[in-house]
Amino acid sequence: MVDNKLFPTFPTPVILYNFGKDSHDLNVSLVNDILKERKSDDDGRVASNMGGWHSILKMEDRYDSFKTLRDKIEECSNDYCRQTGHEDGLIVEKLWANISGPADINMPHHHGASALTGVYYPLYEMVDGEMKVQYQENPKLLPGSWDGKRGGSVVFHDPVYGQKIRLRKTKDVSPFTIEHYHLYPVS
């Protein structure tokens, strides 16, 4: 099992799992497979992303690296259930990848029928054509790292965000053209 740290600050506890240096080969494989997938499907799909690239779902069916990651996530997900007093036996599926650059964002959203959702960040930088990865023994959740070198902000939203709202029908509206959201309660 990987190192983990429970943050019981929220009604739904957050646990940070650190795979550390042992995940180096997996990280290299994941990044290479993600870049290979992007090369084969440069447009990707549009979901909550505004800018950036979003792969197809079920990457674990296409790449061994994602199958390995899925197994690790499934182990951590069931550990999360045990630590927080829930029944384990979760099955992890439908993994995907996002590539985001400067000014790319993902709009707040929820993942429908998912029991848990999480994110795995294989952060790296290319130096002289070689992938370099820094591993921290005790990473901290630090919202507001705006320099782009350590990733973006961590923002927590209410898990039921958007479930009982609707957007008024307006001509020519898409996630890329709308300037204001007008939210109306659904009774």
Short names for language-model regions:
Residues G85-L95:
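A short coil-to-beta-strand element that immediately follows conserved catalytic motifs
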Residues K94-V186:
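Catalytic core of non-heme Fe(II) oxygenases with the double-stranded beta-helix
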